[in-house]
């Protein structure tokens, strides 16, 4: 298939298709450009910085330093409902502890600011208006209740070319109706108008050529009802205006890249589009690495209590049964995943608990896994509003910043050869996107301790 990956990734609402069965192909090669490179780390201040985010920052930092480029920090704080006081300061402190001080960003200066998205609203409004004027975006007046009704009626519903004319928006309404709705102050969002019968094709530095059929893409919201941009709009505008040459981010954003390529095209910036690199997921460690005779009873009790707290509808009496089942299942930790998939003679409570255990012990590493499994998943300690939102970090566990960087660098990147211990400068010179793995990488706390 011309090296096009025809696979599904863990990302929302998009499937990769062959490029041969569609009427038109949009293609953009993003070969590495290594002169005057500019990379950004762009976290959202919604809480403590997860170790997966630190790895993303590290890969951006290493590539920038290797080629004498610029590493900048941009704070993506457009979702004010999720803003957490102190989170931005935490992010900066974590980067500085690890020796990754940005060249530009809030508090660091730079010629491309402001570096907080909440301070750049006029720019987003300007370019959103351009898309509206060109017919590449449209007003949508649907209420949250109306959208929920659509989802209840059809679980596969998505707001796309097939559905948009059945909804309340400036494409389905008469011009005078749209004018009246706007004049009356009717709440609206602005959506991207995804074209029909096209394939969006781009080159990812990790995953090679990737293709998305636009029939599988929804019309993403670009501007919310509160006048703030979504990630998609703000991200593209900022990356272009800040002259970002490489976008290194997590795999969960891979499907969104199709929308971003369209936005670059519609805004006339396609020739300046950055290179993309989507990093593999960080996965939970194998249960074999942390379950032993001493930890199994504690883990079984913890899982049963957490299940009971999250699912009170299962009844208070089930907690002891859940603990007993977990104790039995954990004894055969090597085949735990298989046991949790078995459904023979399961009652509803047991089936629900098995699903909970599967999600808790396998899959993507989450911020709750540190307390749950007994190791840090944050660089620094974080004190939240409650005990359940407070975490101990690598620094407080006694890890050195150099050891933490070395450990994180090898979570998804293979330097080749036998060397595992790297000084920071050695990491900088050795790092390349070409040796970043496609498959997810399991977190291994024993390996982290070895580096320390």
Identify the function of each model-found stretch:
Residues 4, 8-9, 16-48, 66-71, ...:
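Non-catalytic terminal extensions that flank enzyme cores
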Residues 33-94, 220, 225-256:
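N-terminal catalytic cores of NTP/NDP-binding nucleotidyl/phosphoryl-transfer enzymes
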Residues 60, 91, 131, 135, ...:
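Residue-level signal for inorganic ion chemistry
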Residues 89-112:
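A glycine-rich helix N-cap at a beta->alpha junction
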Residues 139, 143-362, 366-367, 372, ...:
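Active-site cores that bind ATP or allylic diphosphates and position pyrophosphate for catalysis
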């Amino acid at each position: 298939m011309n090296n096009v990956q025809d696979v599904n990734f863990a990302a929302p609402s998009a499937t990769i298709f062959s490029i041969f069965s569609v009427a038109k192909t949009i293609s953009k090669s993003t070969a590495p450009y290594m002169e005057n490179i500019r990379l950004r780390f762009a976290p959202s201040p919604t809480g403590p910085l997860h170790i997966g985010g630190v790895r993303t920052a590290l890969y951006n930092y290493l590539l920038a330093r290797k080629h004498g480029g610029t590493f900048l920090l941009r704070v993506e704080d457009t979702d004010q409902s999720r803003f957490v006081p102190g989170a931005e300061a935490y992010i900066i402190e974590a980067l500085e502890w690890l020796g990754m001080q940005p060249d530009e960003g809030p508090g660091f200066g730079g010629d491309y600011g402001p570096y907080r998205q909440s301070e750049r609203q006029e720019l987003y409004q300007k370019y959103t208006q351009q898309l509206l004027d060109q017919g590449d975006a449209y007003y949508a007046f649907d209420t949250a209740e109306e959208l929920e009704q659509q989802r209840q009626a059809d679980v596969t519903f998505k707001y796309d070319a097939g559905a948009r004319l059945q909804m309340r928006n400036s494409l389905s309404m008469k011009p005078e109706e749209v004018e009246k709705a706007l004049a009356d102050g009717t709440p609206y969002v602005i959506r991207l108008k995804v074209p029909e019968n096209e394939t969006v094709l781009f080159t990812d530095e990790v995953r090679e050529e990737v293709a998305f059929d636009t029939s599988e893409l929804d019309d993403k919201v670009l501007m919310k009802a509160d006048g703030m941009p979504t990630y998609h709009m703000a991200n593209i505008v900022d990356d272009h205006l800040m002259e970002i040459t490489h976008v290194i981010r997590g795999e969960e954003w891979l499907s969104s890249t199709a929308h971003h390529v369209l936005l670059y095209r519609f805004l006339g910036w396609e020739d300046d589009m950055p290179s993309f690199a989507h990093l593999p997921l960080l996965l939970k460690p194998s249960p074999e690495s942390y379950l032993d005779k001493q930890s199994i009873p504690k883990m079984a009790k913890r899982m049963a209590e957490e299940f009971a707290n999250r699912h009170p509808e299962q009844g208070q009496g089930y907690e002891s049964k859940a603990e007993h089942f977990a104790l039995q299942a954990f004894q055969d930790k090597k085949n735990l995943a298989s046991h949790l998939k078995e459904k023979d003679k399961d009652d509803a409570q047991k089936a629900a608990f098995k699903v909970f255990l599967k999600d808790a012990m396998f899959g993507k590493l989450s911020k709750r896994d540190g307390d749950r499994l007994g190791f840090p998943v944050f660089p620094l300690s974080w004190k939240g509003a409650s005990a359940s939102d407070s975490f101990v970090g690598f620094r407080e566990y006694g890890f050195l910043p150099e050891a933490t960087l070395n450990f994180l660098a090898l979570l998804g990147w293979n330097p080749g050869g036998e060397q595992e211990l790297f000084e920071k400068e050695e990491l900088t010179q050795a790092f390349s996107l070409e040796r970043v793995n496609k498959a997810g990488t399991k977190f291994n706390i024993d390996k982290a301790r070895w580096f320390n």
